[in-house]
Amino acid sequence: MNLNLRVLTPNRVVWDSPVNEIILSTNSGKIGILPNHASLVTAVDIAVMQIRINSQWSTIVLMGGFAKIDNNELLLLVYDAEKGVDIDPQEAQETFNKAKTNLNKAEGKRQKIEADLAVKKARTRLEAINVLTPTSISN
């Protein structure tokens, strides 16, 4: 038995096909989702979602949003999403480095919050392609 996963952004459908297992980061922690999971509505964090199809794992970077699980259907409505295989490692590393530089230069509360968010998004993209592990990245 499978789960039907749909990942939607305001502009496109990122994923719409059956999967065997999902590891999803919510605002209250990571959850594993298998077929026949209890119904649930939750906020989704900026994080990497892991997807298993048979024995193969894939990743999708989620930039926050909401998830609804019901009757083996998982619907994710997210602000933005990107498949891990579509991320250019060199560009992702450059974006992360630039975001960290901007965070160090940030002045004022608003600039620091925006810069910190940019670092989190860039770090998440790197994690999706395994360039860096979560424990090897520091702010």
Swiss-Prot record:
tRNA processing among keywords: no
GO molecular function list: ATP binding; proton-transporting ATP synthase activity, rotational mechanism
Major location (coarse): plastid
Pfam families, sorted: ATP-synt_DE (PF00401), ATP-synt_DE_N (PF02823)
The keyword Ligase appears for this protein: no
Locations listed in the record: Plastid, Chloroplast thylakoid membrane
GO cellular component, one term: chloroplast thylakoid membrane
Residue stretches spanning the membrane: none
Tree of life domain: Eukaryota
Self-association and partners: F-type ATPases have 2 components, CF(1) - the catalytic core - and CF(0) - the membrane proton channel. CF(1) has five subunits: alpha(3), beta(3), gamma(1), delta(1), epsilon(1). CF(0) has three main subunits: a, b and c.
Function in brief: Produces ATP from ADP in the presence of a proton gradient across the membrane.
HAMAP family per the UniProt record, alphabetical: ATP_synth_epsil_bac
Family per similarity comment: Belongs to the ATPase epsilon chain family.
The name this protein goes by in its record: ATP synthase epsilon chain, chloroplastic
Organism, scientific name: Welwitschia mirabilis (Tree tumbo)
